[in-house]
């Protein structure tokens, strides 16, 4: 047990003077002296009284001093968001601007496509140079146009494979630009009668009557066998003849013979 310092009781004013306390602190090796220390014997003998009176900085106080809006350092969510942000930005590709063709360019492209469905590299480069376009633009337009052309051609074959779709086939020939243009360009395959094309002896197609090849030639051959004209229309109605008119005609003819 450490001995009591009697000077604390004999000269209390020495310890209450701040100047003397600072001098004593420097002479004792920088040891801290609590200004609020009590002079009770229990407090003087307890070595933990000095440490408990001074609040130590704790991690809780440090964290509370930080701004609540600032993210915590080392947080798993923060690290994951930081790592994923460059990936999300890199995976987003810039969308290419769509090419806008003029009416003249579209007309020339359509005319060229009607003559030649597939272009060689040399022909494509010449066409692009003549129209003021790039080779890639002409190539992309031809690919899209061929896709549309094949889709329109397949629609007619799908309808012909269904025996109950003859009305839909007639509507297709009237409205579908692909088949309308194709049939108008091949009018030599079909006959004409008084400029009023009709269906003569119309036969509803069945699956056995349709060629297996899915091409426009097979469709045209089937339509030619049914005597389809380039413009579908309803047949003319023949003039109606009643029995009374036939009887009157025979009577008038008999009277004319008797007069002779």
Curated annotation (Swiss-Prot):
Composition skew (Low complexity), residue ranges: 59-76
Tissue: Expressed in PVR neurons.
Region entry Disordered, spans: 44-93, 228-260
MF-aspect GO terms: DNA-binding transcription factor activity, RNA polymerase II-specific; RNA polymerase II transcription regulatory region sequence-specific DNA binding
GO terms, biological process: neuron differentiation; regulation of transcription by RNA polymerase II
Superkingdom, taxonomy of origin: Eukaryota
Predominant location: nucleus
Keywords for this protein: Developmental protein, DNA-binding, Homeobox, Nucleus
GO CC annotation terms, alphabetical: nucleus
Biased segments, Polar residues type: 77-88, 235-251
Annotated localization: Nucleus
DNA-binding region: 94-153
Its biological purpose: Required for cell specification of the glutamergic PVR neuron.
Protein name (database record): Homeobox protein ceh-31
